[in-house]
């Protein structure tokens, strides 16, 4: 269980904080100079390491909830420790954040957790009442990139219609309208990635169910799928090295992955009724010129393409907390009984 790694992770954080000269001394947001509509980010830069006003952690496998900044409380921590919605390293984020925040007398927050769900109602119907589509994906980086683009073009995020393509260890392609992520693939669907299969033919998958245990099959589709299943590596750079020396199998699998990502972006263009202001490309794979060039061939007819390589999720966490401290957004609480 992921919870078994909690103390180890806490020790690593303590060591990193100590080496950087941070000590957990608390101070209220008001005393620190954080007031509604204030410039908290600038003040924080000069505030030093003497006092903590907030601690942010990565949101984990929680019940479906709106995007936003959430106050971490005992209810949320209990839900994450129970891991009813799956084991994931992000389940430790809020638990660790609350531990360190309490030692400093500060509040702990999560921002846009992986289960943050803003889908429109029609996106939830799967084709069978036995199975409802639910969202798990890269909300934090996806929403942060959308907001970043909005700032750069001088428009409100809520006024833009965007497709965001996140390409990391998993692939999330999402449609954004009126400041909400109204549809996307979930981590169990869509394009295959470095180690996930994405969508599979259902009847073929049913036939596999009797050939291996549920745990083994789950691993095959979520951890040992995608590039790894075909090529034995999750490393995109290794795949590109093979392509450079003429490996046709590597080239074929690479091309199929980009093809599927482009196809998913086309589906999101349909969700937005063809009215798209920009296609934003982000995540670790966006560092690859080859990936971006191939992908442009599939999506640049939709709208102008803007590339944001990498995943600046630490900044996204900080920005989410600053929106609360500045009074731009109210901190939410996870609903009970979900």
Where are these regions (language model features)?
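Structural signal for terminal/edge beta-strands and the immediately following C-terminal loop/tail
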Residues: 309-338
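Conserved phosphate-binding/catalytic loops in two-lobed NTP-binding clefts
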Residues: 289, 293-319
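Adenine-nucleotide phosphate-binding core of ATP-dependent small-molecule kinases
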Residues: 219-274
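Glycine-rich phosphate-binding loops at beta-strand->alpha-helix junctions
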Residues: 276-295
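Glycine-rich phosphate-binding loop plus the immediately following alpha-helix
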Residues: 92-99, 110, 117, 125, ...
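General beta-strand structural signal in soluble alpha/beta enzymes
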Residues: 55-57, 107-113, 163-165, 183-184, ...
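Short beta-strand-loop/turn "lid" adjacent to the catalytic site in phosphate-handling enzymes
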Residues: 21-27, 48-89, 107, 115-127
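Phosphate/pyrophosphate-binding loops at sites that engage ATP/ADP/AMP, CoA/4′-phosphopantetheine
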Residues: 13-27, 43-53, 152-156, 265-277
């Amino acid at each position: 269980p992921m919870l078994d790694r909690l103390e180890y992770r806490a020790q690593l954080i303590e060591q990193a904080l100590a080496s950087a000269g941070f000590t957990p001394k608390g101070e209220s947001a008001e005393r620190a100079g954080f007031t509604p509509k204030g410039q908290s980010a600038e003040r924080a830069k000069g505030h030093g390491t003497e006092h903590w006003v907030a601690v942010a952690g990565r949101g984990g496998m929680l019940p479906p909830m709106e995007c936003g900044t959430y106050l971490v409380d005992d209810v949320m921590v209990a839900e994450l420790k129970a891991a009813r919605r799956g084991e994931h390293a992000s389940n430790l984020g809020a638990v660790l954040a609350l531990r360190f925040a309490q030692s400093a007398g500060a509040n702990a927050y999560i921002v846009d957790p992986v289960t943050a769900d803003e889908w429109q109602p029609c996106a939830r119907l799967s084709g069978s009442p036995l199975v409802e589509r639910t969202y798990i994906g890269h909300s934090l980086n996806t929403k942060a990139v959308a907001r970043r683009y909005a700032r750069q073009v001088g428009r409100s995020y809520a006024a833009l219609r965007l497709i965001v393509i996140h390409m990391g260890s998993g692939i999330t392609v999402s449609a954004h309208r009126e400041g909400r992520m109204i549809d996307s693939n979930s981590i169990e669907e869509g394009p295959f990635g470095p180690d996930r299969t994405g969508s599979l033919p259902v009847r073929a998958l049913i036939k596999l169910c009797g050939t291996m245990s549920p745990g083994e099959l789950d691993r095959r589709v979520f951890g040992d799928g995608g590039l790894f299943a075909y090529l034995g590596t999750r490393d995109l750079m290794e795949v590109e090295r093979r392509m450079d020396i003429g490996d046709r199998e590597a080239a074929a699998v690479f091309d199929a992955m980009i093809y599927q990502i482009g196809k998913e972006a086309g589906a999101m263009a349909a969700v937005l009724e063809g009215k798209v202001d920009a296609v934003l490309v982000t995540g670790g794979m966006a560092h690859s010129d080859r990936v971006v060039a191939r992908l442009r061939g599939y999506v640049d007819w939709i709208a102008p393409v803007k590339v944001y390589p990498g995943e600046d999720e630490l900044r996204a966490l900080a920005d989410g907390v600053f929106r609360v401290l500045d009074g731009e957004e109210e901190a939410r609480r996870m609903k009970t009984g979900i």
